[in-house]
Curated annotation (Swiss-Prot):
NAD(+) binds at G408, P409, Y410, G411. Keywords: Cell membrane, Electron transport, FAD, Flavoprotein, Heme, Ion transport, Iron, Membrane, Metal-binding, NAD, Oxidoreductase, Transmembrane, Transmembrane helix, Transport. Residues 1-9, 74-106, 223-272, 341-533, 599-707 are cytoplasmic. This is Ferric reduction oxidase 5.
Length: 707
């Protein structure tokens, strides 16, 4: 198994380096004028036409990597002794490369890996622009030798606008990789979609800036040569300028509404505007043409596979078992799941409640452990914003069921919670919730006597005393004393806006639990193609892409080639790229639907078993469940393990945690893992402390859902 993984990894590295090499060389004079004519003899066939070269050099390698990564990630889930040793070395390398290098706005927390790859990518963009400008100014402008200085200046100005657009195209080759939620590419470098959204934002800013400059330059150029109406031209056999104009208008709308100041104040406008990305892609592809579209096809193809599979999953109604209403007015929702659904700590689940919004989906942190809780999955929801406020109102009313759809779970492909000697978990407000799943996973691992558990220090800061109810969720309700006896947990809780414990507690502030009746259309959350089924996802990717190549080859050979004869100047320019997009969508639809339905049929037995289990519960809704320990309310005898939370917790009023003191006083551990989730200021403060070099045993990791 280890040899096969090494072989697959080596093959992926070779393919990726070759793919990057093509991107490096494609802007050079050697590639344009020497290599391209030679390659065209072999790759510009009657079956693929002018787009054949880009398909072979830039599309096939990355699609092949996506398939191989499914095999690699599948074997990673099969543990062995050699693999555990390999993982140890891998974590050490990731620790060094994940060290914080800088903390600054607007980039945020930048690790060594991020800084290295960002600088390399910027170098690639500068290299491409300089090469393209050299080609334009010193090679292509020889036709203007006899022209006056004004014509040469105009030609150079136009060339700059054209080439800056090419640089933006480079960004589009990577733009959709970070937002592919069930990506098989991101886990290869230890990333998740949620943690990679900032790369999508960076790429979006750079590409939109390049395209805006490209558009403005051409508008000025056409005004100078009295051809301003070219802005609205739609050439049948050449670049349709109007398509580019429409794409730019959509792009600016998406760009402006995604700026942090706009997005946070008017999230719904941002949300709905961002869903214009489909039109943006269509008009952009029409503008650049089929050959250039094939250069960026892999990340778009993989994104749409993921998007369609997510759509298929979201058509199912998920079985909501119960809802806890915390004294802090926050919620914990518990869903039924099949026992075959596995996920890692710090994972997230997307929720959709049609009675609140027909279109909106929102991500929430999973607090349960798939190893400890085989048949249920829980998420915590903070009441913040109009959507969560409406959900809270719904659940507070006298309802016996709620229609909910889910997507996910999504999270790290692997998460070894016991890899450090000690763990310091720093959370602010609802930022504590990802650490609940970490602690529950440690409880599960404590059942294995051979596992050495780290000492855990949970440092949490809350605005008000009633927010301490978050800590009631650390242990599952059915946990026993023996299950937590090996866990060395210490909690330091800070109440920043109150100087002492409230003397009284309002009745409506008690922790309440509501149970919901099962509905015929509800089903447990089951594994989706991705983290739980990498091989099947690989089958979807491979079959849909092979089908796409066959269909595009047939259409080109028997429909386009008889008209165009590979000249690229006779058959309609727009129709050519529409064929590529249409056939790609058809292949994704057919392949994904067949595999999804096949897997759904196989999962039916598991669904039936889970339904029997949840239906065996007597669904009565108590007015309130046992209250929170931190509100002095008595619990039932079987809830005695919760006393250990109180015993392990020190509550500090009227102050914030001294994070520098806490981190530097980490006792007697060579390897201290520091995880932080909360407000940006808190994350940045912890990152600066860990990167200061004063404590080399601190290994930093940030969990952020505020992008």
């Amino acid at each position: 198994m280890g040899n096969m993984r090494s072989l697959v990894k080596m093959l992926m590295v070779v393919l990726f380096l070759g793919w990057i090499f093509v991107w490096i060389m494609i802007s050079t004079n050697r590639f344009q004028n020497i290599w391209t004519p030679k390659l065209a003899k072999y790759l510009k066939t009657t079956y693929f036409g002018p787009q054949g070269m880009n398909l072979v050099l830039l599309t096939v390698p990355m699609m092949f990597i996506a398939v191989l990564s499914c095999v690699y990630l599948h074997t990673q889930k099969q543990p062995s002794q050699t693999q555990s040793l390999y993982k140890c070395r891998e974590w050490k390398v990731k620790g060094r490369m994940g060290r914080v290098m800088m903390v600054m706005n607007p980039l945020g927390i930048v690790t060594a890996t991020e800084l290295t790859f960002s600088l390399l990518f910027l170098a690639l963009l500068v290299w491409a622009l300089s090469n393209y400008l050299y080609l334009s100014y010193h090679v292509h402008l020889h036709n203007h030798d006899n022209a006056n200085d004004m014509c040469r200046w105009q030609a150079k100005f136009r060339a700059f606008g054209l080439r800056i657009g090419y640089v933006g195209h480079y960004c589009w080759a990577f733009l959709f990789f970070p937002v592919t939620r069930a990506s098989t590419i991101l886990p290869l470098v230890g990333l998740t979609s949620e943690s990679s959204i900032k790369y999508h934002i960076w790429l979006g800013h750079v590409s939109n800036f390049c395209f805006l400059v490209h558009t403005v330059v051409f508008l000025i150029y056409w005004a100078m040569v009295n051809k301003l109406m070219e802005t609205f031209a739609w050439n049948a056999t050449y670049v349709p300028n109007l398509a580019g104009t429409i794409a730019m208008v959509i792009g600016i709308a998406i760009w402006v509404t995604s700026l942090p100041s706009f997005r946070r104040k008017k999230f719904e406008i941002f949300f709905y505007t961002h869903h214009l990305y489909g039109l943006y892609i269509v008009f952009y592809a029409i503008h650049v043409g089929d050959s250039w579209f094939c250069m960026i096809l892999p990340n778009i193809f993989l994104f749409f596979i993921d998007r369609y599979l997510r759509f298929l999953q979201s058509t199912k109604r998920s079985r909501l078992v119960s809802a806890k209403i915390l004294p802090s007015d926050n919620l914990e929702l518990t869903f039924a799941k099949t026992s075959g659904l596995h996920y890692t700590p710090t994972s997230i689940l997307f929720l959709h409640v049609p009675s609140i919004s027909k279109l909106q989906w929102h991500p929430f942190t999973i607090t349960s452990s798939s190893n400890l809780e085989k048949d249920t999955l829980s998420v915590v929801i903070r009441k913040q914003g109009s959507w969560t406020q409406k959900l809270y109102t719904h659940l507070s009313s006298s309802i016996d069921s709620l229609e909910v759809s889910t997507e996910g779970p999504y999270g790290p492909n692997s998460f070894d919670v016991s890899r450090h000697d000690s763990l310091i978990l720093v959370g602010g407000g609802s930022g504590v919730t990802p650490f609940i799943s970490v602690i529950r996973e440690l409880i599960f691992q404590s059942q294995n006597r051979s596992t050495k558990l780290p000492n855990v220090l949970l440092v949490c800061a809350f605005k008000n005393y009633h927010d301490l109810a978050f800590l009631d969720l650390i242990f599952p309700s059915d946990i026993s004393v023996s299950d937590i006896s090996k866990l060395n947990l210490r909690i330091e809780a800070y109440i920043t806006r109150e100087d002492k414990k409230p003397e009284t507690t309002d009745d409506h502030k008690l922790l309440q639990t509501k149970w919901f009746k099962p509905q015929p259309l509800d089903s447990p959350i089951s594994p989706v193609l991705g983290p739980n089924n990498f091989l099947w996802l690989g089958v979807v990717i491979l079959s849909s892409f092979v089908m796409f190549l066959l269909l595009i080859g047939i259409v080109t050979r028997y429909y386009i080639y008889p008209v165009d004869h590979n000249t690229g100047s006779i058959y309609n320019f727009t129709y050519r790229v529409l064929w590529v997009m249409f056939l790609g969508c058809v292949c994704i639809f057919i392949s994904s639907s067949i595999i999804f339905l096949w897997r759904k049929k196989e999962n039916k037995e598991g669904d039936k078993d889970s339904k029997k289990q949840v239906q065996s519960v007597e669904f009565q809704t108590p007015t309130s469940s046992p209250g929170s320990w931190f509100h002095g309310h008595e619990r039932e005898l079987e809830s005695v393990p919760y006393q250990s939370i109180v015993q392990a917790t020190s509550v500090h009023f009227g102050s914030k945690p001294n994070l520098k003191k806490i981190l530097f006083e980490a006792e007697g551990s060579e390897d201290v893992g520091v995880m932080v989730c909360g407000p940006k200021k808190m994350r940045h403060e912890v990152a600066k402390i860990c990167s200061s070099g004063l404590a080399k045993n601190l290994h930093f990791e940030a969990i952020s859902f505020n992008w």
